[in-house]
Amino acid sequence: MDIECDIRKINKLNYNNENEIYKLKKLNHPSIIKHYDIDEKKSEKNVIIYQESINGGISIDKFDNNNFFSQEVIREICEQILLALRFMDNHQIVHRDLNCSNVIIFPETLTIKIIDFGVTKTNFLNQDYQSPEVLKSNNFTHKSDIWSFGFILLKMIDKSLNNIPDDLPTEQFDFLHSCLATNLSDRLDAQTLLHHPFIINKPILRFSKSMKLISSPKKQFELVNKTEHEIILLTNGTSETFYLNKNESCKIKISTIDLYIGVRFDDGAILSSPRPTKLIEQEGTDINSFIIDQSCLMAHNITFPNISFFESISEII
């Protein structure tokens, strides 16, 4: 089956191989663009990189800050970038060219893709995005990506900002200082920043109209304010064969369909987790042996007393 992809060309005279681009082929993370193949022989002048299509996405620098980047949206985007940076750190990958034009947002689902990793000999970064150690000695580390990330956050707050304003909310102010610390030992890594109050205290976001309601089990759960609302299950996929089966046991096949846990309030308003949950296989093929991963929900201030009620999204075979 053919895969829709984009093509990136890099002039061979400016191509810094060192196997870095081949490491990228092995990365598999929802917020990092997939690199399908690299062809160094097809063109005499260019290295050809075949990568995941980003149709429907918009780079951060193309957005109108006032109309899109609310505090809630900024926190959600920051968390997704940090999750990707933590993953890269664990795989010893440094982006080297992280800036607003290299973070793509898909507005309908509020998800992101980090693109255009720096695999060239020349550093094209705007100096604002370059950490002090990069400017001084061209020394790139995972913490130089954190500095670049800090400037992305500044630009989401206000495109005109080049320094941290004093009038920011306390959590955001402290978070930015932790990203833009001149001293490397004071600059926090992605793992630590993910536990900063600016991230862990972010609210749940409103349901995207692009999602489709595929099930509404009559089950109640509690929000942190102790009011009860209806659990709903949503997806932005289109497969009609997937459904929630509560009572029957049968052979099933797990799909890669994205699932979102949602809340329907009495007035009809719907809230949803901004990122998909995961299905975990516990044992066998019994529908009752599947539960939804709770770790994706913990940051959204939602408590599920009996999450195993969602046994599975399944397809009969």
Swiss-Prot record:
Q: Which PANTHER family match?
A: OVARIAN-SPECIFIC SERINE/THREONINE-PROTEIN KINASE LOK-RELATED, SERINE_THREONINE-PROTEIN KINASE CHK2
**Got a GO cellular component term for this one?**
cytoplasm
Domain remarks in the Swiss-Prot or TrEMBL record: The protein kinase domain is predicted to be catalytically inactive.
Listed Gene3D superfamilies: Transferase(Phosphotransferase) domain 1
One GO biological process term is: intracellular signal transduction
Disulfide links within the chain: none
Give an example GO molecular function. Answer: ATP binding
Ranges of residues in domain Protein kinase: 1-199
| UniProt-listed PROSITE patterns | PROTEIN_KINASE_DOM
What InterPro entries does the record point to? Answer: Kinase-like_dom_sf, Prot_kinase_dom
User: What name appears for this protein in its UniProt entry?
Assistant: Probable inactive serine/threonine-protein kinase DDB_G0268656
Q: Which family does it belong to?
A: Belongs to the protein kinase superfamily. Ser/Thr protein kinase family.
